[in-house]
């Protein structure tokens, strides 16, 4: 059996590995679009730990397991305590014996890191206060499907507008790793910080990607993809709605004027859920340049590929495993034979 692989951050994967994962995801998507559901996860069980509520993440993981022949178990907030009454070590050890793979959407990034360290099965980060790596994969699938004619990924410019959320940082990680140009256009005090920049510097040195952090709206010009997220994600408890609006509105609202400034062929992306009338207008969200609902569908696309990628590698059999399997099958059939 091969050593297990976790998916905690894309920083642990090479560009080639991530592109292979996306290629696998899109191939499975094509199969399903044509009516064939490959049973690649037959008899596999996914344990889903949620410290935070979710729509797209939960539905995508449950649907992915079901479509590929497996099963998902939803462990809701309050049903399981990571490091509470039971230690993370004990929780991960037990779930490793009951499931084939785990996904955790956690409040603190260290919780999913500790879970992966203690588990003997693969662990996926479904989002933490540090990053959102499954969103990254869906975004990469979407950008590849909507590449401008004649351009490669490394020719493209991606601009994130607004607050430095986990999604903003995750988008910066995946785009710079692909050798793309990334821009964070946001107000001072709500931009990617020195820790983020240190990580991005390391990636760009190897990939040839580049990034800019600015509050100058001219940085939007020439964008191939314009991306935004909600304005209250990180500061909901600290800032009132009125304070948030004073900081972000109207300069950082993606509207038709901003899209025009980016360029005629620019596509609009949003991780959802969106607050229409705040970070995004109805006109752009529902307009011809919006690919945010394709992006939402590709959460499922990429999660199918990720589950197969991690489980197929981890569960790869050798001839001795097959011999043991046949022997166990014979013993069970003998036991069940009527006397």
From Swiss-Prot:
Compartments in which it is found: Cytoplasm
Enzyme class label: transferase
GO biological process: arginine biosynthetic process via ornithine; citrulline biosynthetic process; putrescine biosynthetic process from arginine via N-carbamoylputrescine
Gene3D superfamilies on file: Aspartate/ornithine carbamoyltransferase (3.40.50.1370)
Record-linked SUPFAM superfamilies: Aspartate/ornithine carbamoyltransferase (SSF53671)
Pfam families: OTCace, OTCace_N
Entry EC no(s): 2.1.3.6
Keyword Membrane tagged: no
Catalysed transformations (reactions): carbamoyl phosphate + putrescine = N-carbamoylputrescine + phosphate + H(+)
Pathway in which this enzyme or protein is active: Amine and polyamine biosynthesis; putrescine biosynthesis via agmatine pathway; putrescine from N-carbamoylputrescine (transferase route): step 1/1
Residues bound to putrescine: 270-273
Residues with site note (Important for structural integrity): 29, 145
Positions bound to carbamoyl phosphate: 54-58, 105, 132
Keywords: Cytoplasm, Polyamine biosynthesis, Transferase
GO cellular component assignments: cytoplasm
GO molecular function annotation: amino acid binding; ornithine carbamoyltransferase activity; putrescine carbamoyltransferase activity
The family this protein is said to belong to: Belongs to the aspartate/ornithine carbamoyltransferase superfamily. PTCase family.
Subunit field text: Homotrimer.
Job description of the protein: Catalyzes the phosphorolysis of N-carbamoylputrescine to form carbamoyl phosphate and putrescine. Is involved in the degradation pathway of the polyamine agmatine.
Protein name per Swiss-Prot or TrEMBL: Putrescine carbamoyltransferase
Organism of provenance: Streptococcus ratti
Organism lineage: Bacteria, Bacillati, Bacillota, Bacilli, Lactobacillales
């Amino acid at each position: 059996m091969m050593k297990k692989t976790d998916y905690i951050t894309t920083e642990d994967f090479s560009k080639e590995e991530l592109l292979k994962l996306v290629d696998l995801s899109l191939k499975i998507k094509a199969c399903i679009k044509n009516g064939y559901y490959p049973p690649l996860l037959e008899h596999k069980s996914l344990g889903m730990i949620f410290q935070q509520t979710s729509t797209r993440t939960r539905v995508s993981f449950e649907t992915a397991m079901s479509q590929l022949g497996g099963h998902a178990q939803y462990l809701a907030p309050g049903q399981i305590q990571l490091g509470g009454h039971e230690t993370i070590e004990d929780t991960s050890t037990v779930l490793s014996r009951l499931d084939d793979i785990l996904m955790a959407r956690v409040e603190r990034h260290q919780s999913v890191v500790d879970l992966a360290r203690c588990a003997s099965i693969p662990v996926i980060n479904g989002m933490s206060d540090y990053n959102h790596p499954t969103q990254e994969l869906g975004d990469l699938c979407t950008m590849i499907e909507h590449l401008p004619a004649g351009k490669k990924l490394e020719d493209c410019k991606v601009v994130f507008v607004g607050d430095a959320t986990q999604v903003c940082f995750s988008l910066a990680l995946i785009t710079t790793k692909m050798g793309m140009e990334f821009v964070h256009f946001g107000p001072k005090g709500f931009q990617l910080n020195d820790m983020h920049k240190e990580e991005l510097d390391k990636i760009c040195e190897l990939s040839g990607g580049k990034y800019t952090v600015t509050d100058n709206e001219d940085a939007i010009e020439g964008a191939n993809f314009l991306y935004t997220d909600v304005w209250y994600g990180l500061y909901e408890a600290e800032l009132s709605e009125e304070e948030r609006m004073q900081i972000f509105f109207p300069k950082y609202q993606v509207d038709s004027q901003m899209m025009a400034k980016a360029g005629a062929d620019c596509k609009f992306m949003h991780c959802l859920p969106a607050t229409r009338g705040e970070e995004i207008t109805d006109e752009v969200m529902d307009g011809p340049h919006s690919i945010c609902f394709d992006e939402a569908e590709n959460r499922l696309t990429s999660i199918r590929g990720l589950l197969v990628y991690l489980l197929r590698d981890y569960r790869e059999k050798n001839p001795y495993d097959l011999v043991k399997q046949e022997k166990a099958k014979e013993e069970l059939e003998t036991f069940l034979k009527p006397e």
